[in-house]
Amino acid sequence: MAIDVNKFESMQIGLASPDKIRSWSYGEVKKPETINYRTLKPEKDGLFDERIFGPTKDYECACGKYKRIRYKGIVCDRCGVEVTSSKVRRERMGHIELAAPVTHIWYFKGIPSRMGLVLDMSPRSLEEIIYFASYVVIEPGDAPVEKKQLMTEREYRELKREYGASFKAGMGAEAIKDLLASVDLAAEADQLKRELQEATGQKRVRAVRRLDIIEAFLQSDNKPQWMVMDVIPVIPPDLRPMVQLEGGRFATSDLNDLYRRVINRNNRLKRLLDLNAPGIIVQNEKRMLQEAVDALIDNGRRGRPVAGPGNRPLKSLSHMLKGKQGRFRQNLLGKRVDYSGRSVIDVGPFLKMNQMGLPRPMAIELFRPFIMKELTTRKLAGNVKSAKRKIDKADEDVMDVLEDVIKEHPVLLNRAPTLHRLGIQAFEPVLVSGKAMRLHPLVTEAYNADFDGDQMAIHVPLSDEAQAEARLLMLAAGHILAPKDGKPIVAPSQDMVIGNYYLTTEEAGREGEGMIFSSVEEAKIAFASKVVHYHTRIGIQTSSFPEAKPFTDEQRSKIMVTSVGKLIFNEILPVDFPYINEPSEDNFKGISDQFFIEPGEDIHDYLADTAVIGAFKKGFLSDVIAEVYKRYKVTETSLLLDRMKDLGYEKSTESGLTVSMNDVTELTEKPAILEDAHKQVATVTKQFRRGLITDSERYQRVTEIWTKAKDVIQDKLIASFEPTNPIFMMQDSGARGNISNFVQLAGMRGLMAGPGGKIIELPVTANFREGLTVMEMFISTHGARKGMSDTALKTANSGYLTRRLVDVAQDVIVREWNNNADRGVAVKAIMDGTSVVEPLYDRILGRYAMKSVFNPETGDKLVSRNEMIDEDVAKAIVAAGIEEVTIRSVFTSTTEHGVSVLDYGRNLATGEEVEVGEAVGTVAAQSIGEPGTQLTMRNFHTGGVAGGNDITQGLPRVQEIVEARIPKGRAEISEVTGTVVAIEENPAERTKAVTIEGETDTRTYTLPLAARMRFAEGDDIQRGDAINEGPIDPKELLAVTDTLTTESYMLTEIQKVYRLQGIEVSDKHIEVMIRQMLRKVRVMDPGETSLLPGMLMDIADFQRANEPALFDGLVPATARPVLLGITKAALETNSFLSAASFQETTRVLTDAAIRGKNDPLVGLKENVIIGKIIPAGTGMAEYRKIKSKVVGEVVAQPEVEQEPTPDIPKLDDVAKSFEE
């Protein structure tokens, strides 16, 4: 029966009873045959039998008596096949009745063994019983043995002879089944609860585990004996297909081989039982049947895996679910889709921000059904068939229709790897010739694409809703800001930068300097007549600018001094935006009075005294974009970006920028600098030979000498560059390359690292212009090779980190506006020693204040409680000298399965308050994972300084923190608040003892002798402070302090890693991840509740479980917070679907089945898996309940020539418009 995916609320998993398996089945599979090799028809009673599984051809029985849909539902009287759609062969199951019970390997073999826990037996004993090595006592009767005792064949025979009928023992799965059926779960649970009150140590741990499993059986209505199977389900044949290859051979799914082994052994066992064969033969056959079923369910879990042809292990049912190629990750979480294509991308400078160039052949294929509909509607084709023929012939009519079909039908472009949400954006297609898709040059940054052969995939959203969503939420013009830090991600690069840089450069003494023009037009005419140059400094009557330009009245009466290029640059800015004359933030408030002269004043005198203003570099252009976005939002910004792109391309072409060998200037002082360095090295070597210094000191001094020499050359080289040198312009403007590239071209390459990462003390003194010697070339190759392998490793590591992060945070969604949390987090600037890692401004911007903030000097209120701190407020707070602000934080959010708007604050990608329904968890994971590839893989070695531990940095450090591992070289932390009373060194044992006296007790800590102390004798120390230098183990910190301290420490540490590499990631993303690591508590004392000691549970579930006890005045349970690494946290989620599709699939499913777990489908992943609309954005329950109706008639819109890019409306507004 078909289930409407969007209707059901939750999904439950459990153990299947034999009757349940029979009820699923459409018939028993009795023979191992598959397909008759001559007729290619399925064999009767075989694994592909049409009577059991349905017809192989649509609406046609096996013998051909009934054909056509009109006989639907009839069962043929000749061949017994039901006439129906052949699709049922994907859903109808069969079964095999086993001649002897067989244990399910998941429940016997898993860790811990579930059968072992229920029976209180060791896995070793179970194995001996199941595989017929020992007997087990089922009923001792009068015999002097215990129940569940193991015995040999000989002991069994003697006891059987002596005690006869009352004594009962057995072996194999049958014995296990009897034992499981005889367990009284309720009595066992009571007994264990009593035991728990006395037990300690290992005994207690075992009791807790057993109680957990037994309670699970009691609460789930699963019977323990169902872990042993009498019947095996046979999955539908189309899920284990058999196809004929050329040459008459067959390719088949491994499952068919595994099923055939089971059926063969089962049939043989039946025959042996009918023949009353000797016990030892039957036993052997039962053991083989058990092994065959084990291999079918999980091949290779026990013993050697069953291999197929070529000694390849066969893929069992478990393998079908596991891993990247398993059912979950290959077919449920990501599917191949139709209406998609892929092609090489090329640059499309002629495109608007919201357009992409679609090659005509691709467009015809992608929009085929739409074209066919349009052709028939316009009566250009008589029917669908003739329309199809026209398309195949590429008729002219098709091309005419194509233009209209693709108009306003957005398409999605994706580039792998999709590291963050900007890896998929929507565009309006524009038809282009050729076979390459054209991409707008400004979106390349977000996609991390270049045009050296990159390919991209294109997808066509089909339904109206999908098109609306693509247009409103995904259009590229709306994605100006990066979600990780809220800075513009679409900034001009390369040619566009150099063009605008060249245009806005000023040069003293250019032709026409000091001319005064009455208007911009007049200046342009002068330029066209070659009277002035772009770089010429000129005057212009300020009154000639439009009224909207923000000049003061005084400025309007004067002459403004600027350059011709800047006049042209300012024309692309919005009309009421301040005139930009210098690359500074202050210019955004309004142009400075220093650039104006009185009408009668001599402009030449002014210019003689005034220095040349620098050109607009890449960073400043980015600032302009951010400022325009802040003031005018999306539409105006995307139009500005296009204008800036066009201007940049045009002027970089005009500039005629070239690079030649002569631009790489030689440094005349270089030989002298090198000579000096060689002399210093010789001196150091002499000192070493005389034994004045050690080898490591010599090595260190030599490397220092060469580093210094390279720095001197670098400084002199920069000073010697002409400002008009094209190479210098490229670097200075930020278009391409940095200073070290040019030092290597014209200065010296310097010291290189060897294969082990150690610096080779022979420097590469040559540069690329002179050319390297063979020796130098080989020294250089080490670094190049290491760089390549590092990058490859880094990409894999970073991708896996992102996957784990997404998995742990995927159900964090903004669920409400305010949860009335009663505490916030006090934040101050993050420091590393004396340097600021992240300033207070960055930490409070776009967050909500927990309590009002007042200016300490004047007493003025700067921001109220629950009010957002915007740029102006943040600046005011910093200016007022306030160092600490209490803000609403994700850490203190009380919203279940998510956060509230006030906790999260501003959505960095839009610059607006975040909306209910935003999937902030996934965005957070992407924001932390995406820059992962830029982090280093290396651990820095502190050049042989004694006591300096190697510090883990970069990607390994981030992993160490989020996996909550014990860090390398960790520091000891104080467990008490008090004073350091003594530090005693013990050189013999290479340790030192630090004694701290607290208010109530005194603690002594033993540290390595080389440890660098953070406290001296007599210093005060707080609990949780690190005593010596080094990273703290967050689990230890949590045990000594509270959750908030631990969370803040982890946040600070992660920020240090990213900011050190110059990567800005907003605090809130890291907060989301860390909160997910701390959402569980472990029950310490169950009090008078139904909880079990040692249980891991969500904080919200724990509070709910405690409510009845508190209500009835009973003793509530107590628990302590637990810090889980992200992998563990992702596996401990309440959704078994999400956990199973992440890692350890069989373990997760085994556990979920025994507990009869119910998946409430609150996260994104579980809904994707079952194909339900995800509960984020418009898929949230409150948006889904909205009904829509059309009021009045729909009026056709008049056609507009070139409409600007639409503003991106909010989700709430979209929902409201549906509502209305």
Swiss-Prot record:
Zn(2+) binds at C61, C63, C76, C79. Its cofactor is Mg(2+); Zn(2+). It catalyses: RNA(n) + a ribonucleoside 5'-triphosphate = RNA(n+1) + diphosphate. Residues 1209-1220 have a biased composition (Basic and acidic residues). NCBIfam families: rpoC_TIGR (TIGR02386). It is an enzyme of class 2 (transferase). Keywords: DNA-directed RNA polymerase, Magnesium, Metal-binding, Nucleotidyltransferase, Transcription, Transferase, Zinc. Pfam families: RNA_pol_Rpb1_1, RNA_pol_Rpb1_2, RNA_pol_Rpb1_3, RNA_pol_Rpb1_4, RNA_pol_Rpb1_5. Binds 1 Mg(2+) ion per subunit. Binds 1 Zn(2+) ion per subunit; 2 are expected compared to other organisms. The RNAP catalytic core consists of 2 alpha, 1 beta, 1 beta' and 1 omega subunit. When a sigma factor is associated with the core the holoenzyme is formed, which can initiate transcription. Belongs to the RNA polymerase beta' chain family. GO terms for molecular function: DNA binding; DNA-directed RNA polymerase activity; magnesium ion binding; zinc ion binding. DNA-dependent RNA polymerase catalyzes the transcription of DNA into RNA using the four ribonucleoside triphosphates as substrates. One of its GO terms (biological process) is DNA-templated transcription. HAMAP family: RNApol_bact_RpoC. Residues 1197-1220 are annotated as: Disordered. InterPro entries: DNA-dir_RpoC_beta_prime, DNA-dir_RpoC_beta_prime_bact, RNA_pol_asu, RNA_pol_N, RNA_pol_Rpb1_1, RNA_pol_Rpb1_3, RNA_pol_Rpb1_3_sf, RNA_pol_Rpb1_4. Mg(2+) binds at D450, D452, D454. This is DNA-directed RNA polymerase subunit beta'. It comes from Leuconostoc citreum (strain KM20). It comes from the Bacteria. The keyword Transferase applies. One of its GO terms (cellular component) is DNA-directed RNA polymerase complex. Gene3D superfamilies: 1.10.132.30, 1.10.150.390, 1.10.1790.20, 1.10.40.90, 2.40.40.20, 2.40.50.100, RNA polymerase II, clamp domain, RNA polymerase Rpb1, domain 3. Its EC number is 2.7.7.6.
